[in-house]
Amino acid sequence: MRLPTYVPRLLLILCFTAAQVLPAAEVDTETEAPETAAAADVVDDADNEEEEDKGPTFAETVKGFRHLPGLFDLYIDDEENKVFLALTPEQFGEVFLCNISRTQGDGFFFDAGATIGLGLSGYGMPIRFDRVGKTIFFKHPNVYYQAEPDAAIRRAVERLSDSVLGMATIEGQPHPETGAVLLDPSPLFVQDIAMIGFVFSKMDDVSYSIDAGMSYFGELTNHPTNTEVDVVLTFTTSSPKIEIPTLPDSRSFQHIYHYSLSQLPDSDFRPRMADDRVGHFLTLHQDYTSVLDHDAYVRYVNRWHLEKAEPRFKVSKPKEPIVYWLENTIPVEYRDAVREGVLLWNDAFERIGFEDAIVVKQQPDAADWDAADARYSTIRWMVQPGRGYAVGPSRTNPFTGEIYDADIRISADFIRYAYREFTELANPVARRQQAIGDSIASTLGLLGDPMHTCSMADGLMQEAAFGWHVLNARAGDGGMADPDVQSYLRQLIIELVAHEVGHTLGLRHNFKASTIHTLAELHDPETNQREGVAGSVMDYNPVNIAPDGHPQGEYYMTHLGTYDYWAIEYAYKPLDEDGDSERKQLARIASRAAEPDLTYATDEDAFYDTRGIDPHATRWDLRDDAIAHYRDLISISDELWSKMEDKFQKKGERYQTLRRVFGWGFRPYTSGTGNVARYVGGIFHHRDHIGDPDGRQPFVPVPAQRQREALAFITEHVLGPDAFQWSPELLNKLAPERWQDFTWSQYVGVTRIETPIHQLVLNVQRQPLNRFYDPMLLQRLLDLELRFPADEEPFTMAELFATLRSSIWAEAIQGAPINSFRRNLQREHLHHLETLVLRLPA
């Protein structure tokens, strides 16, 4: 049974409802005086006990403690690792912002530098301290349902529960002058705030939980507008079921979480209404002021507060630029490329009137501030061995959508990814780590916002490895020349950084942007310089490798695409105060959605499974003709395989290199087979509004002839009898890695050390078959017969079945010999037919 969509969110908010505490009734001493002397004595005794219960004075409580003034004053006993936090009466009931980052990870399950988001808050969580007697409640206030102050329904909205994150008891007496009270903040901060224990509970063979007795406060710093708190959390298990290669002892590890508590931004920032035709991250709430509105949601674009210093000029510097700091962990040799990737976005801002909207600064080696400090937006290098990825979250004001902090983290291993084996050929432990990573990501998807998920870097590194080996196969005996290597890596880093910076500027993915250029345009230097390789850096763009003998353009996006300029214009263009209303001006910008170069689709349009209906809304595709593009890529794979013995089999080198190169030749198959299969039963989906210039209908079936072309491509290049052919000599040279490593991969989980070639091919062939025989796709094919124009013969389910049957069983029909790959394929085909007949859901 499918859970309602709201259930995961309800589970993650930690919704403990605070009991309503009613004030005690006031006693009228004249009318309700004690009736007896004994009763009077009881009252006197109670008064005396109350005086004694006040405890030590404020000064006595913090005697010997180091005072650290700031937003929330801290008192610290370094020897005892004891901390008091002071709250003034004015701070009770006020909403603050709490940003949480993991600044130290274990390197296997979780990395360092991660931004932690909780529930509906995303990455900028509102918090509030409420006092009830001598108890302080640490709350996540419910700001997601609102109404105007003078609306009667406001009272009902305010009765919706907040979430309680922790509680603490007041220590000693208030400060005699400020009225501030002291509390031990350990129960508030020294807790499993990231719900690591919950994540592990959903995984097999992993059983770590927090040990509060071994957890403690780390570094504490304070500033007038923000308080920074580090907590060291220890996770332990008495029975580790797997060896963690990044730990000296798998029975325990420590994470450091950094809390950055700050005031809400105080500015004249104006929220900007979002539009579904352009892809931005959103801050949203439901407004109950009027029940007549057709949609209760109010959606704001997430964006930085950017204003012209000189509004009268067409182009002006901003009052306050967006500043990114390059953390001192970034290798020196990559810093220029990282800087270039950040500053790429200034081109888009200049078109709408901002000069140098973005500024890049270098963190000094001796800097005394931490990148987790909410005052600094950073780009950081972090270590998680064997993983190649990058993410770019930002933090926003939950009331307005104003972005006030962003921290991009990039895996140090992503450059080395080209030297790894392809995923299907990786050692069992490496595959297991990938599976664990996928399980963690899936579980965290229940806790956070799936729209903020980004796996671009992992796939980009696979693309980079494929391109790297192809270019080395085409080069002379010495491989790529050093300048070519540096140019390749520079372009790669620029695109990766520009993509993640785009996220921190508020832009979502655009998985249609890669479809706007022809083959000639992809490799035309002028087009590359003017419009980039694709329509947006926010797509998952593959490496742009030209077919053998064809002129070569840029390998990666080193310039913004046409969509990027449009998305920045919508979010940041200063609006004319004297012109049309804001809504009309924004609608005019968004109404360009039907222009071919502005085509847009995002994560919810690009599901990998059969929920994804649009063959243009895919990852790792390129060119206006995807089928032709993948046909070229398969020819490039054949080229790589044919040249690999000559180019990579060098005297004195190890045979493991050949196995690695052989594996990367499968990359076009793993990325392309599923994408081409989407044309079969596909529907182009558009977000145009009624009345847009050249507007399109929401759904347009893929032409039947195009579906037949896609199926023909699959049957020839993936399912056909001549699809996969290698010499025995080559297969016998594909040696596995025999060096010892931290994972004992040459022992643990090893079943076969030779290359499982039939399994590799079958894995590729299963991709289209799994899609073609999925009940949802078959139902869609049936429905599509009603969607085609009367003058077009539709592509039908019967045609799909007949084409696959005649292709897969051609030898049996003709009485010809059947090779081993085809026998495997025929067994797989029978399995799908059996499933349809015997176990098809009602």
Question: Where do the model's predicted regions map?
Answer:
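Short pre-active-site segment immediately N-terminal to the catalytic Zn-binding motif
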Residues: I330-Y334, G479-V497
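The catalytic-center signature of Zn2+-dependent metalloproteases
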Residues: Q362-V383, Q491-P547
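Conserved catalytic/binding loops enriched for acidic/polar residues
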Residues: G476, P483-Y488, A513-A842
